[in-house]
From Swiss-Prot:
Catalytic subunit of the Rab3 GTPase-activating (Rab3GAP) complex composed of RAB3GAP1 and RAB3GAP2, which has GTPase-activating protein (GAP) activity towards various Rab3 subfamily members (RAB3A, RAB3B, RAB3C and RAB3D), RAB5A and RAB43, and guanine nucleotide exchange factor (GEF) activity towards RAB18. As part of the Rab3GAP complex, acts as a GAP for Rab3 proteins by converting active RAB3-GTP to the inactive form RAB3-GDP. Rab3 proteins are involved in regulated exocytosis of neurotransmitters and hormones. The keyword Cell membrane does not apply. The Rab3 GTPase-activating complex is a heterodimer composed of Rab3gap1 and Rab3gap2. The Rab3 GTPase-activating complex interacts with DMXL2. Interacts with LMAN1. Belongs to the Rab3-GAP catalytic subunit family. This is Rab3 GTPase-activating protein catalytic subunit. It is found in: Cytoplasm; Endoplasmic reticulum; Golgi apparatus, cis-Golgi network. The modification Phosphoserine is found at S173, S330, S373, S375, S384, S458. It comes from Rattus norvegicus. The keyword Transmembrane helix does not apply. Residues 324-351, 386-414 are annotated as: Disordered. InterPro entries: Rab3GAP1 (IPR045700), Rab3GAP1_C (IPR045698), Rab3GAP1_conserved (IPR026147). GO terms for molecular function: GTPase activator activity; guanyl-nucleotide exchange factor activity; small GTPase binding. GO terms for cellular component: cis-Golgi network; cytoplasm; endoplasmic reticulum tubular network; excitatory synapse; Golgi apparatus; lipid droplet; postsynapse; protein-containing complex.
Amino acid sequence: MAADSEPESEVGCPLTPLPPVSIAIRFTYVLQDWQQYFWPQQPPDIDALVGGEVGGLEFGKLPFGACEDPISELHLATTWPHLTEGIIVDNDVYSDLDPVQAPHWSVRVRKADNPQCLLGDFVTEFLKICRRKESTDEILGRSTFEEEGRVADITHALSKLTEPAPVPIHKLSVSNMVHTAKKKIRKHRGEESPLNNDVLNTILLFLFPDAASEKPLDGTTSVDNSNPAAEAGDYTLYNQFKSAPSDSLTYKLALCLCMINFYHGGLKGVAHLWQEFVLEMRFRWENNFLIPGLASGPPDLRCCLLHQKLQMLNCCIERKKARDEGKKTSPSDSMTKAYPADAGKAGGQLGLDHLRDTEKEKGEAGKSWDSWSDSEEEFFECLSDAEDLRGNGQESTKKGGPKDMAPLKPEGRLHQHGKLTLLRNGEPLYIPVTQEPAPMTEDLLEEQSEVLAKLGTSAEGAHLRARMQSACLLSDMESFKAANPGCCLEDFVRWYSPRDYIEEEVTDEKGNVVLKGELSARMKIPSNMWVEAWETAKPVPARRQRRLFDDTREAEKVLHYLAMQKPADLARHLLPCVIHAAVLKVKEEESLENIPSVKKIIKQIIAHSSKVLRFPSPEDKKLEEIILQITTVEAIIARARSLKAKFGTEKCEHEEEKEDLERFVSCLLEQPEVAVTGAGRGHAGRIIHKLFVNAQRAAAVALPEEELKRSGCPEERRQTLVSDFPPPAGRELILRATVPRPAPYSKALPQRMYSVLTKEDFRLAGAFSSDTSFF
């Protein structure tokens, strides 16, 4: 193409000679073949589970990255902004326009449309479970675990009543953990199951690492706090998302179910693993093995409900384990400690009562009776009465009766109060051992609130509500009375609620200033609940009181709740944990790349998720928005890594060049078009040039041999065919001139013509101006 004076002819220039025409040319070259820069990301292989690795990632962590190169094309625009007409030749045979010599280079990247990103796909597929309606039984086939269990219990009911002996289990392993469960499952599901044994055992070992220990399980929970900074950040997230700590069993279970759902069995695999998990929970409850990966203490209401339920079950196991361990203590030893040899001489009835109480205490604190025997409250009371009868029989020969009753002896003391003494007898005030409050999950608290609200605002309803809420108060009063014989309500209030005992200085008859105290106004209200409870309370130490927390009943409620969960319910419970894990993953990956725009999006994701996940049953649309944001971040990070690999940022020998390249890559991610500093002679320009050269050489090697044989030596022919750049995908020209129009004496005005030529298209556009004065 030889540049001519098209603008002058178009505008009908009346001048001779014609004014000069300025030409700007831009050629665009497209790079699609990246050659050695292939995309290495491969989908995880579930078979690698058994080896402890999945897709090159540590098992238990979500995978990350795109399965295809997220950068599909690179567009290089070489620009000659100021050329003079008549000196440039550009045609099919020859061209003066060498891209390497162009003074300006700019680059655009074309992104792959919706690249498959592993993390986004994992979370999206897990969300789909929430929309399923099937129950676990419908998915796996009707199970009769419970029916077989009932038959076995009924068959051995009498033997359990007459021979209450704990089953000795010295070591727990994966094999005996799931052996019985697998036998029962196979009866109803056939020999094939969604998860094979290797995968299942690996997952169970990951969830329950204590099962692999050669030592007997001591039931201690293990929480890894090796990284305090990370733990602090994670605390903020799980608190905001209402999920679970990242080292907890609930969090690990969510990751396992997410991976199984995506790669191994889908919904069936999820149902299978969940059923195994529930069986494991019952096994641990029945055999007093604490659940690992759960913080000790009452349920954490900041976590998801499923995590709270597992913590509640752990609390039940702790209480049951304490009772069973207490039961192993020999009767003679415990009686010697609690009942001195000369106690019976002081009064036979007191001795008998004390022995009965001691026996009852052992029944409370150390009861094993297999798993079912304390499954209902009436069973527990009957067993306690049986022990009372046994105690009566043993002590029937002792002398004494009601007339020989001795003064009450203090029981259940924790330690002496530092300052206070009893008001009536001046004895030191002792702080009693009290029962711990019953742990509660958020759904139990809601139920309790509903019951209390239904009592209404009447006087009777208010009184009943107060009595229901004062069970713990009554227990503490009884413990206080047992620890402090001769005490009064004022003594209890001074310890339990000091602000309700008002002291003031007064002058006595002798003129001395003394302290005089009295109960507060609210304690003097008629029919005060505290006064009623104090009058009702008997001096009974905590160890002999009726339990505030029936661990057996609560454990069975939790196990029933777990067994009734459908996969959709389970996914709803665990989705906050999965999103929590996904956010932690993108934060971890972003920290390696340091992309400012991604940091901003992650903050938006956290803020959005905190609002959505704090409430039960969030809308699917809002959840999808969160997942879309996570996928967007994943794609941006994948693009950054793709560009860094292509431009070889890690191979730079000079730190300055490396920083320039990283800045260039960052701009490519965030801007539609980026200028190349130094054009073809700069560091980035040389890399781009090399990319095109490699692609051209590969294209020449792939040419058919027939074309190489047409003329001359193959090597010579190949050399003539190979150029550094392919033919331009697009040619753009802008012709500019300043011409007086429409008359020679008109004002000289700018004239512009634009043309673009591609393989499929040719466009021509002009912008011409005329002097309108006097015309």
